[in-house]
Every structure is written in C-alpha cells, then in structure tokens.
Amino acid sequence: MKLGIITIERDAVVNDLIKSCEKYEVDYKVITPSNIVAGFNLDFKLKYYKSFLDELDCCFVRNLGWDSFFRFDVLKYLNHYIPVINPPDGIDRASNKFLTSVFLELNNLPQPKTVVTESINEAIVWIDKFEEAVLKPIFGCGGEGIVRVKKELPISTKLKILNEFKEKYNTFYIQEFIKPVRNEHRDIRAFVVDDEVVAAMYRIGGENWKNNVSQGGRVEKCEITEEIEKLALKAKNALGLFYAGVDLIESEDGLKVLEVNSTPSWIGLSKVSEVNIADKLLEKIIQYVKS
C-alpha cells in the first residue's frame, strides 16, 4: 500500500505512524501541504514534486495548519480519487464546535447545555442561567482560549471578559460548566478507529480546572465501559469520521460528549494504553483500503 501523510510538521504522531508503516512494510510519503499543486485541463490532478497524489492508495491527514481554505479544498478534490482519512467533511464538522453540536443534536447524543451567539447581551443572559459557564472559541484545540465565567462576577468584570473574547473570536460558544462528580476535575478521551474503541484514558486537571494534557493535566488508564463504547462510537459516526478522539465528561445524569477531535494525538494515550495505537490505526486503514 502507498500512503501519503499530509502534515506541516513531522511531530511525534507522524513519527509514530511512520514506525508502524515501516513495521507493516507500507510505502509512505510525508507531504507538506504548501507544496501541493492542483492542475485542471492538464496531465495531472494533484502533484507533489514528481509524485501524483491521486496515484496513492490513501492519504492520512495529520495537520494542515490554520486558516488554509485552499489546503482543505485540496483534500476535497483529492477525496474524489482516493480515500482521505479523515474524510474532509468529517474534519470540517469536528473542527467547528458549532457544527459538532449540530450533528450531536441531530443524532440525539447527550452534550452539555450549549448556546452559540454573537450577542454580548445574550451571552450574559445565558451565563447567568447556567450560573457557571465555559466560553470556548468555535475553532481551536488544546484548551486554548477557553474561559470559565461565574454568574456572581460583577457585571463590569463579565463585560470585560466578553468584550476581550469577542475581539479575538467574535462568536461565543457557551456551555454550562459540568461540576465534577468526584473531588477532581477530569474527563475521558476515547480513541475510536472504524468500529472499535481501541483505548481510553482519564485526563485529570493539573493546577487549574482544564484537563488537557497540553494544559498540565495528567493521564490515567480508563476502562472502556459499555456506556463509553456506545457513546464514543455514535459520536464518531455522527460526524462522519473514520477515526476520532472523543472527549466525554461524567455528570450526575451520565456521560456527555464534550468534543470530537478529527486529527487527535495519541501520544499521551499511548502511555496508558496496552494497545499500540498507531499499529491499530494503520491495520484498520489497510483493511479499509483493501475492502
């Protein structure tokens, strides 16, 4: 099999996948998206130096970089000729928190109470209704830009927070803050590949309430319960993804979906997983391409 790996940098995830490619004797090519050339009414469709991308068996998308509509459109074009993992439409839905909430809602999957608005007045109304809320940028990952706001804050403080947030991100994605069911802040990352939840971990908050490993959180192994398996698979499928990192949070009335990641890292999860995640992912990709 010939696999393209599209990424702006050769990070730990890419290196891990390359090791698996070498183990399984998969012919791979690391592709820098800025050097792809699209052709029309010519003798090629998509070219990378002297290689033709539509002659690959599959392309794996790791990191396109930010704010590149052209690169994303290239994926859509490429997907007409070969499988792209993850599918561009799925990446589009998962990278946009508003669209993620839309598809979770359409598929009747539990998520925290959420409102999305550009109005500062409406934002204040809903922060007060939730009593404690989390503001998130619609686009973003790793916990960056996320702000926790409480009802009891002075109105001047709330306005300052909201004005600064709006200046940066324009749109407010506001979720009720889910109070921890135990004594510590934690959530669950379930790693789903095709029809299988291959591993899961607890991400436990560091010095603050954010559980992201990139924000100082630590990881512990999480047993894959029937509830985790069922919800993670449904969330992945709702967004039209081949594989995903599904973030779940425990609440008094069961698990809720926080986020679905379409280009998730598995490096932190590998520390507590008995499964070699890169191997499992590549095995599933090979099966998919052959089917």
UniProtKB/Swiss-Prot annotation:
ATP binds at residues 136, 175-187, 203. Binds 2 magnesium or manganese ions per subunit. GO terms for biological process: protein modification process. Residues 101-286 form the ATP-grasp domain. It comes from the Archaea. Homodimer. Mn(2+) 2 binds at residues 259, 261. It is an enzyme of class 6 (ligase). GO terms for cellular component: cytoplasm. Mn(2+) 1 binds at residues 247, 259. Mg(2+) 1 binds at residues 247, 259. Catalyzes the ATP or GTP-dependent addition of one L-glutamate molecule to tetrahydromethanopterin, producing tetrahydrosarcinapterin. Keywords: ATP-binding, GTP-binding, Ligase, Magnesium, Manganese, Metal-binding, Nucleotide-binding. Mg(2+) 2 binds at residues 259, 261. InterPro entries: ATP-grasp, ATP-grasp_RimK-type, ATP_grasp_subdomain_1, Rp_bS6_RimK/Lys_biosynth_LsyX, THMPT_Glu_ligase. The keyword Ligase applies. Belongs to the RimK family. MptN subfamily. This is Tetrahydromethanopterin:alpha-L-glutamate ligase. Its EC number is 6.3.2.33.
